[in-house]
Curated annotation (Swiss-Prot):
UniProt-annotated stretches for the region Disordered: 44-76
Alphabetically ordered keywords of this record: Ribonucleoprotein, Ribosomal protein, RNA-binding, rRNA-binding
Binding partners and assembly: Part of the 50S ribosomal subunit.
Organism: Clostridium perfringens (strain SM101 / Type A)
Protein function: One of the primary rRNA binding proteins, this protein initially binds near the 5'-end of the 23S rRNA. It is important during the early stages of 50S assembly. It makes multiple contacts with different domains of the 23S rRNA in the assembled 50S subunit and ribosome.
Family as reported in the entry's similarity comment: Belongs to the universal ribosomal protein uL4 family.
Matching Pfam families: Ribosomal_L4
Biological process according to GO: translation
Descriptive protein name: Large ribosomal subunit protein uL4
Recorded name of the encoding gene: rplD
InterPro entries: Ribosomal_uL4, Ribosomal_uL4-like, Ribosomal_uL4_dom_sf
């Protein structure tokens, strides 16, 4: 079973913690990771982009000048795509980008993402601030030399969230909001011991 250090928020190791092999020690499935990340990013898209084709732009029904004899290039409509204020060629229309992923694949992707982050994981014995204080959050991150950090707490923690929300490259979320994209996108995964236990309850 994978074993990692257990730290306090001052950066001092206070012990070790055994991680469940079914969650943090699986074979990384790159295909599942790719599928879930693509679906997650696709599902974030609004799909509301829209433009008009030449048939939808107002006007342009009459031929601007006769076909021959003017010395100018032949034109059929002032709303053709080559004209200013003309329609758009293959104009985008609103569409639904949603993708559905099987539950089993989502689980495989999540355990693969967690396994791939074990080497960059910092497990905290506890994480709480008496009051929202960005200075305290910066001090904690500096103690671990953390860059582009994802902080996962067991529950919604307002003090931790408010302390870290203004720090560039730091994301804070409760354990029930974790997702594959954010796990893969961080350089350092900072997670509380209680949050680890909750993850193992769900995915083991």
């Amino acid at each position: 079973m994978p074993k990692v250090g257990l730290f306090n928020k001052e950066g001092q190791q206070v012990g070790d913690i055994q991680l469940n092999e079914q969650v943090f020690g699986v074979e990384v499935n790159k295909y599942a990771l790719h599928q879930v990340v693509v679906a997650q990013l696709a599902n974030k898209r609004q799909g509301t982009q829209s433009a008009k084709t030449r048939s939808e732009v107002r006007g342009g029904g009459i031929k601007p000048w006769r076909q021959k004899g003017t010395g100018r290039a032949r034109q059929g409509s002032i709303r053709a795509p080559q004209w200013i204020k003309g329609g758009v060629v293959f104009a985008p229309k609103p569409r639904d980008y949603r993708m559905s992923i099987p539950k089993s694949m989502r689980k495989v992707a999540m355990t693969s993402a967690l396994t791939s982050k074990v080497a960059d994981m910092v497990v905290l014995e506890d994480l709480n601030f008496e009051a929202p204080k960005t200075k305290e959050a910066v001090k904690m991150l500096n103690a671990f030399e953390a860059k582009k950090t994802l902080i996962i707490t067991a529950e919604v923690n307002e003090n931790v969230y408010k302390s870290a929300r203004n720090i560039e490259g730091v994301t804070v979320m409760p354990v029930n909001n974790i997702n594959v994209y954010d796990l893969l996108n961080c350089k350092t995964l900072m997670i509380t011991k209680e949050a680890v236990n909750k993850i193992e309850e769900v995915y083991a």
